[in-house]
Amino acid sequence: MLRSLPASLALVAAFASKASAHAAFWDKSMYGFNVTAQTFPYDNRPQVPLYNMTFDQWWFHGHKDYPPNEGDFFELPAGGEVNSIISCDKGATPFYESSPGGDSGYGSNSPCPGQPMSEYHTTGIDDVKGCCMAIAYKPDVNDVQPDDFVVFSCNSTCVWEMNTKFEIPKLPACPEGGCHCAWFWIHSYDSGAEQIYMNGFKCKVTGDVGTQPLGKPAVPRRCGADPDHGKPDPTPGNCTIGAKTPMYWYQREGNNMFEDTYDAPYYNPLYGFNDGAQNDIFMDGVIASLASSGTGSSPTSTVDSSSSAAAASTSYPAQPTSSTQDAPGSSAYPSSSSDSVNSPTTQPYPASSASSTSEAQTTPAAVPTSVATEASSSPIASTTVDEAVVSSSTVGSINPTRSCKPRPSGVAAQKKKRKHARHLHNAH
């Protein structure tokens, strides 16, 4: 029996390693702070990846009914910086005492102490793709919609260390009751399956707060140098400048990004997110080439499709359409309407001309009715929406698991794998 003990311990250690993979933002201000693997019918701990889920399952990680204690806020010092805790395991953070397994490595600055880099989806520091924080100026979590969030800070070397700094722009004060924030991460395509990470938390702006309201956010666009896809030079005219939304990708419904399996969107310069505070968030988001030409001064400007390659939607700049993607996702946020419209897809590879921002044919992006019609008192700059385009998603419930989604097979997928030299032997 004693001989079998080391083998048993090895098995337990291996299981523990697998169970604590992936990463999450950890703070007492977060939703789902005390959620365990047994809270839901499926493993829905904060560090579990999100993919192919219904809107209610991925939005705030499905943790809206597990709020922080009254008065717990993550403080954002206006014009300063803040330290955040990002880890694969709550037990490896300063909050280990409330972890079901207790202390599992606290004291290390690794996001996953004692585990290989594949557990936090990277092959090395050159393979990290960045993460971000976004803010919504609404105190009631049930009022927060996807387009309310504005990305205000990015860290381009994330996930790499447990202690991760975020620079804070001169944000205006939150309303009474505070703001809502969220941490977002999409890892490298060559270090795991296609998925996103989102953890919501209560936050408030402190210190010498600003007075300028945030602009109306627009969807980010692929515009940076992309040598892996034969684009050695950036296409700045294709960037979204100004306030930008987070990137909602690879879900069953609620996507605003439609890149395919091997073209993941990232919170780095490839999508117009520079490292540090996003100090352009005080202007409305708009496609750079349209702004420079004066064609569109704000994302609600209507562009004549007969004279421009880009047509604007009724709320944000239209994204170019492309062929059907492998990623599952409906084109709009859930609504009660029985009507539906086609949603645009983002262009993984911008046109060769810097002045061209999309394909000739575009379709308007659907937005939630509440976003298009709500009169908000938040410091997000108001814009006029000519018409609310509403879509419905009537997708049935699914049964997600914490395991990463298997990759597509077939000749095309295998060619893509070989082309990009994927490192799949330790992927999750």
Curated annotation (Swiss-Prot):
Its cofactor is Cu(2+). Residues 380-402 have a biased composition (Polar residues). The keyword Signal applies. Pfam families: LPMO_AA14 (PF22810). One of its GO terms (cellular component) is extracellular region. Residues 1-21 form the signal peptide. Residues 223-232 have a biased composition (Basic and acidic residues). The keyword Transmembrane does not apply. Residues 414-428 have a biased composition (Basic residues). Keywords: Copper, Disulfide bond, Glycoprotein, Metal-binding, Monooxygenase, Oxidoreductase, Secreted, Signal. InterPro entries: LPMO_AA14 (IPR054497). Belongs to the polysaccharide monooxygenase AA14 family. Lytic polysaccharide monooxygenase (LPMO) showing oxidase and peroxidase activities that are common for LPMOs. Catalysis by LPMOs requires the reduction of the active-site copper from Cu(II) to Cu(I) by a reducing agent and H(2)O(2) or O(2) as a cosubstrate. Shows no activity on cellulose-associated xylan or any other tested polysaccharide substrate, meaning that the substrate rremains unknown. This is AA14 family lytic polysaccharide monooxygenase A. It comes from Trametes coccinea (strain BRFM310) (Pycnoporus coccineus). The lineage of its organism: Eukaryota, Fungi, Dikarya, Basidiomycota, Agaricomycotina. The gene is AA14A.
